[in-house]
Amino acid sequence: MAKVTVKLFANLREQAGKTNIEIDGNDLREVLNSLIEKYNGLGELIFNNEEFHPFIHVLVNGISVKDKDGLDTMLSTGDEIALFPPVSGG
């Protein structure tokens, strides 16, 4: 099982109360399921049913999971997952 770091930004960070979380998992789905079990309320911010919310960006080692295998993206120890919710500004 891989030990990875999940980096949370904006309202995801506020909901969890942490910026960086170390968690174990073999693929992205497993890591995110563990994350939302530990931190109440994150699931609604990340997922719409069983898919990512349309505007959330998920990167593994700086590469969008849309360019990989989505939730089935395999992970290795030391990988970094970044979760970016929609952000607006002016």
Predicted features and spans:
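Ubiquitin-like/PB1-type beta-grasp interaction modules and other compact soluble beta-rich domains
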Residues: 1-89
